Amino acid sequence: CVLGLKDYMAKNHFKGVCLGLSGGIDSALVAAMAADAVGGENVYGISMPSMYSSDGSKDDAADLARNIGAHYDIQPIEPLFVSFQNQLELEGVAAENLQARIRGVIVMAYSNSKGLLAVATGNKSELACGYSTIYGDAVGGYAPIKDLLKTRVWEISRWRNKAAAVGMGIGGLHVVGNEQGSAGTPLPDGVMIPVNSIEKAPSAELRPGQKDSDSLPEYALLDQVLAMYIEHAHGRADLLADGFDEATVDTVMRLVDRAEWKRRQYPLGPKVTALAFGRDRRLPVTNAFRE
């Protein structure tokens, strides 16, 4: 993923990246990868808190930016959200998605005004289930972790911190441009990704008390089903024979099938698994064939 981002930026003449920093694990890992690829000084992290953002998430975003030496700006979205709501008076999912789309506008404003590559931070589990906001958190020109399941995101984040603890600084990965294995720029306290970003329950923080598990099966289970359904092409009967319960199988298959239209519009990114969305797996956008 780091090499893919580094190579894409070099071949398309991008010197830096911008992304939203929510304090969550996905944006933290993507920012860390960007720092390893082009240096923290070329990463522009934007915190865009709302009335639902926790103090812990704000602190985690700031800690991540400080750890990797990134530029860090805070752009609260509540004034913009209130302006939209004064005219639109949205409720429910529409109001939640409005927050994500305001953030997307801000990220793209940084990209356009500073000549930066906007990077999307969605993972494969979210893309599979359509757990993203089109024209919101799905904006960008490149998506470094789009082929990593959520459980893999956690695994890589823990590995990167372990590597940092034993001296692998920013840019210390053995990739093109660092073939000799320079240790890179030392990290403060030997930590790259805030531990709290790794350990806390995932949440989009678009409404009070929201958790990913409100809308999706727990990731430990979800990713097992997704791996068999997507990467091993197991159908419904196969998944049931694999030991997954009927309700979970039907829910996951329905979510995946209905989200094809979103995946068609998602930014490109590296292929790191046996079967990635896009060229490897293209199903019809219309999905009534399941019925």
How does the language model describe each region?
Residues 1-22, 27-291:
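ATP/NTP-dependent adenylation/nucleotidyl-transfer catalytic domains that generate, transfer
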